[in-house]
């Protein structure tokens, strides 16, 4: 959890926002997936948001569903994902690592056991996409027991009660939704969310990172101009993996070319 705090403090000092890429662990295979993650970090990623392949990803659009299918096709299991996480942490001791996943994967292990394993491999945060705030108690309690930040999604239509709950229960960062619906680069992020950002700040919420539909540097800049601490980009990155699926070296170059200007857009 502390890794987020020190990241946001450093960025504030440098007058920068955070650029956070999302990829699915094991897509398109374990070895290439680890290379992808190294490339994202080398190109300027400030933190990582990683998915564990799951058979029924509700909030994901077609791009990320395909990533999951590719990981399954490569035979990637949750146990292997945790081995990958341990390797990533070993190689990159300071970068915040977040998991974005679904409740079934947590239940399969047992809630406490799942968060214990997260702590062991050096995961900093977990966002359980299909668990609303009001049902989150067993998850967030286990998370805090194991020094893992529980992350909550703040939707664009959040009312005051929900904003207070998110501020009170969330740690690490707040996942600020650009819009309702499923993830996807083709659904561009809509209006800047100034009012939500102001409210979250008023209630002392963890710093908001804007996600969903972030696929261009101008959107990263707009998110930060609206008061967000940074932006998360998933589908646009996963699409690059898909486009270069048979050219592993070209894929890494294309990812670098995408991430560098996205990170540059966080600098005021």
Curated annotation (Swiss-Prot):
GO CC: one term? Answer: cytosol
Annotated GO molecular function terms are:
tryptophan synthase activity
Question: Where is the catalytic site?
Answer: 49 (proton acceptor), 60 (proton acceptor)
Would the keyword Amino-acid biosynthesis be found if you checked this record's keyword annotation?
A: yes
Report the coiled-coil segments: none
Q: Does the keyword Iron apply?
A: no
Q: Which CDD domains match?
A: Tryptophan_synthase_alpha
- Entry-linked Gene3D superfamilies: Aldolase class I (3.20.20.70)
Q: Which residues form the signal peptide?
A: none
Q: Where are the transmembrane segments?
A: none
**Which one Pfam family would you cite for this protein?**
Trp_syntA
What EC number(s) is this enzyme filed under?
4.2.1.20
Q: What class of enzyme is it?
A: lyase
Q: Which domain of life is it from?
A: Bacteria
> What keywords were assigned to this record?
Amino-acid biosynthesis, Aromatic amino acid biosynthesis, Lyase, Tryptophan biosynthesis
What PROSITE patterns does this protein map onto?
TRP_SYNTHASE_ALPHA (PS00167)
Q: In which pathway does it act?
A: Amino-acid biosynthesis; L-tryptophan biosynthesis; L-tryptophan from chorismate: step 5/5
Name the chemical reaction catalysed here. (1S,2R)-1-C-(indol-3-yl)glycerol 3-phosphate + L-serine = D-glyceraldehyde 3-phosphate + L-tryptophan + H2O
Q: Which family does it belong to?
A: Belongs to the TrpA family.
Q: How does it assemble?
A: Tetramer of two alpha and two beta chains.
Output the PANTHER family linked to this UniProt entry: TRYPTOPHAN SYNTHASE ALPHA CHAIN, CHLOROPLASTIC, TRYPTOPHAN SYNTHASE, ALPHA CHAIN
Listed HAMAP family: Trp_synth_alpha
What does this protein's UniProt record list under function?
A: The alpha subunit is responsible for the aldol cleavage of indoleglycerol phosphate to indole and glyceraldehyde 3-phosphate.
Name this protein carries in UniProt: Tryptophan synthase alpha chain
Q: Which organism is it from?
A: Escherichia coli (strain 55989 / EAEC)
């Amino acid at each position: 959890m502390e890794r987020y705090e020190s990241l946001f403090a450093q960025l504030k000092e440098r007058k920068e926002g955070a650029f956070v890429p999302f990829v699915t662990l094991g897509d398109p295979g374990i070895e290439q997936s680890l290379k992808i993650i190294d490339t994202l970090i080398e190109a300027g990623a400030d933190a990582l948001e990683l998915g564990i392949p799951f058979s029924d990803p509700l909030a994901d659009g077609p791009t990320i569903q395909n990533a999951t299918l590719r990981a399954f096709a490569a035979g990637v299991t949750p146990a292997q994902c945790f081995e990958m996480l341990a390797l990533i942490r070993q190689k990159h001791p300071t970068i915040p690592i977040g998991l974005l996943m679904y409740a079934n994967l947590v239940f399969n292990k047992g809630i406490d056991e799942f968060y214990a394993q997260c702590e062991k491999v050096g995961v900093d945060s977990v966002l359980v996409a299909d668990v609303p705030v009001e049902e989150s108690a067993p998850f967030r309690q286990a998370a805090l027991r194991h020094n893992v930040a529980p992350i909550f999604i703040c939707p664009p239509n959040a009312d005051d009660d929900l904003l207070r709950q998110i501020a009170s229960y969330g740690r690490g960062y707040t996942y600020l939704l650009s819009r309702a619906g499923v993830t996807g680069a083709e659904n561009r992020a809509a209006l800047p969310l100034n009012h939500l950002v102001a409210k979250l700040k008023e209630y002392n919420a963890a710093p908001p990172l804007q996600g969903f539909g972030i696929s261009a540097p101008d959107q990263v800049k707009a998110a930060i101009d609206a008061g967000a601490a940074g932006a998360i980009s998933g589908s646009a990155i996963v699409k690059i993996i898909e486009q270069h699926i048979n050219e592993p070296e070209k894929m890494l170059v294309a990812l670098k070319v995408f991430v560098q200007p996205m990170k540059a857009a966080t600098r005021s």
